[in-house]
């Protein structure tokens, strides 16, 4: 028979272990694992969500949709939310990596509140992905363009007069000494060469890959990069580069916040008619462990005021009409004004400049416009894994 004292010790240890396991379980239940792009969320909003729901949000970063896919497919980490672009949502769905969204848990979501461009992108996605609306919630959207140094004499004229692409790849059309950068994501790089040839980036064959490779090998780029390209142009180390329009705007906002007047900004962006249009979306992986918390986070981020505040930091355009209207009409979130838009930090012209930027670079289509957004949405239709491998190896 066990000694009573020893028995009590055993019971105490068992109780202690149970408590530790219970606490650990609670902690795990309150941690949201988010896979996101770099510099792509308002961190003040994340902290606010953590406080409101007594949880923690752990953010991992990947630099491309392809990395998103490999991380979700591997299942090494059970992410609760991911923010891939349209074509990658389709691929993840086709591979059985996503679970449907429970829209009954998203009272802040109203499909009628989507901007015309966002609606059109979903409609285009549905041509090859019928269940798109059931698996994604729009996060941010935009285009790609050619950011350039306004102080480089003759550069702006050359870009505009040649619809961007001819000047971008034929450097004889550029002012002497122009330093050009290329966005280092194979799918996007391939698309630029197809736009240059007036071909669709969604057609991939051995012949088009050969054409793309020939163009790239015959074009001298001073730098290949991603997020750093915008900073290189702003600092004068590059003159021209292909990038997200949102990256350009992010750098613009930084300059404005640092006290530079809008008319004194040294760079601008040209958005060709034939370019990439995209929409990044909140999706829930099939292996997510904190599905209810993921829905709470989605609902929190798409709230009108929060979508507005998120767009103010990352530079990309909100897909929600009500939030967009707040921006272009200079409205503020009154109770959060001092937290997010301290006048001493941002300057008195911040809201006016933000409104100008949205209307200039993300203009709403007119009711009579047949095309609701500028650009081409990338698709996975007719593109095999071997094609994607060839594109990757080409770069």
Residue ranges and their predicted role:
Residues 1-5:
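N-terminal secretory signal peptides that target proteins for export/translocation
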Residues 6-27:
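Sec-dependent N-terminal signal peptides of Gram-positive bacterial secreted proteins and lipoproteins
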Residues 26-95, 231:
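Early extracytoplasmic/lumenal segment of secretory-pathway proteins
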Residues 33-36, 58-61, 80-83, 138, ...:
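Structural recognition of the beta-strand scaffold that forms the well-ordered cores
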Residues 53-55, 77-80, 175-180, 236-239, ...:
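Loop/turn elements at helix/coil->beta-strand transitions in domains of secreted/extracellular proteins
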Residues 85-87, 91-237, 251:
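Extracytoplasmic ligand-binding site segments that recognize negatively charged/polar headgroups
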Residues 207, 221-287, 321-329:
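Extracytoplasmic/periplasmic substrate-binding proteins
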Residues 280-359, 363-371, 376-377:
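Mature extracytoplasmic/periplasmic domains
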């Amino acid at each position: 028979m066990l000694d009573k004292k020893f028995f009590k010790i055993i019971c105490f240890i068992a109780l202690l272990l149970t408590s530790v396991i219970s606490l650990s379980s609670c902690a795990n239940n309150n941690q949201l694992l988010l896979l996101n792009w770099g510099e792509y969320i308002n961190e003040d909003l994340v902290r606010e969500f953590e406080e409101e729901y007594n949880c923690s949000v752990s953010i991992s970063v990947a630099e491309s949709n392809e990395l998103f896919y490999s991380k979700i497919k591997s299942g090494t980490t059970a992410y609760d939310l991911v923010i891939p672009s349209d074509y990658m949502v389709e691929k993840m769905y086709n591979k059985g990596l996503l679970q449907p969204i429970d829209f009954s848990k998203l009272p802040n979501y109203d499909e009628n509140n989507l901007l015309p461009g966002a609606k059109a992108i979903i409609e285009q996605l549905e041509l090859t992905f019928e269940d798109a609306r059931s698996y994604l919630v729009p996060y941010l959207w935009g285009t790609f363009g050619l950011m350039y140094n306004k102080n480089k004499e003759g550069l702006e004229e050359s870009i505009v007069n040649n619809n961007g692409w001819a000047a971008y790849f034929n450097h004889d059309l550029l002012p002497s000494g122009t330093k050009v950068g290329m966005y280092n994501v194979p799918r996007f790089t391939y698309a630029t060469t197809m736009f240059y040839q007036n071909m669709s980036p969604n057609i991939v064959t051995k012949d088009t890959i050969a054409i793309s490779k020939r163009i790239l090998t015959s074009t001298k780029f001073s730098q290949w990069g991603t997020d750093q390209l915008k900073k290189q142009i702003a600092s004068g180390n590059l003159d021209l580069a292909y990038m997200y329009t949102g990256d350009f705007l992010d750098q613009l906002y930084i300059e404005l916040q640092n006290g530079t007047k809008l008319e004194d900004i040294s760079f601008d962006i040209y958005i060709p008619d034939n370019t990439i249009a995209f929409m990044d979306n909140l999706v829930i992986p099939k292996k997510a462990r904190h599905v209810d918390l993921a829905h709470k986070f989605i609902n929190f981020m798409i709230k009108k005021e929060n979508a507005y505040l998120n767009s103010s930091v990352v530079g990309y355009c909100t897909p929600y009409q009500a939030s967009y209207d707040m921006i272009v009409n200079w409205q503020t979130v009154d109770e959060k004004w001092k937290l997010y838009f301290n006048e001493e930090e941002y300057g008195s012209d911040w809201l006016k400049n933000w409104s100008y930027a949205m209307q200039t670079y993300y203009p709403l289509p007119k009711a009579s416009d047949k095309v609701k957004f500028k650009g081409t949405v990338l698709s996975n239709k007719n593109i095999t894994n071997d094609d994607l491998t060839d594109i990757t190896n080409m770069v």
